[in-house]
From Swiss-Prot:
The gene is kdgF. GO terms for biological process: pectin catabolic process. May have a role in pathogenicity. It comes from the Bacteria. This is Pectin degradation protein KdgF. Residues 35-94 form the Cupin type-2 domain. Signal peptide: none annotated. Pathway: Glycan metabolism; pectin degradation. Gene3D superfamilies: Jelly Rolls (2.60.120.10).
Length: 110
């Protein structure tokens, strides 16, 4: 568990292909993650067996597909993908950012 997140003290984790992330904070039941995308970077379609996910567009814009439904989301928009729903994104602008919230925490990220 991390009670406080200090941005300047937390390095980016490079994921490759124009995507990097910072784990903001977590408990056993909840996790928040900042994910930064280069223009054209792809969050490959996938689904979670046990995690619900809410993603808030903090900057830029994304093409989002959930269960085959495609939408364009811009700064201030959000989406939810519950467990077992196929979802993915494509960044439409340089520096697009998602704030992802997962329940329960993504132990595989720690």
């Amino acid at each position: 568990m991390r009670r406080y997140f200090i941005d300047d003290e937390t390095p980016w984790e490079e994921l490759g292909d124009g995507i990097k992330r910072k784990i903001i904070t977590w408990s056993d039941d909840l996790m928040m993650v900042c994910v930064h995308f280069a223009k054209g970077a792809i969050g490959t379609p996938h689904k979670h067996d046990i995690h619900d996910q809410i993603a808030y567009v903090a900057a830029g814009s994304f093409e989002v597909v959930i269960e085959g439904e495609k939408r364009i989301l811009k700064t201030g928009d959000a989406y939810m993908a519950v467990k077992n729903e196929m979802h993915g994104v494509v960044s439409l602008e340089e520096g697009s950012v998602l704030i992802d919230t997962f329940s329960p925490k993504r132990a595989d990220f720690l």
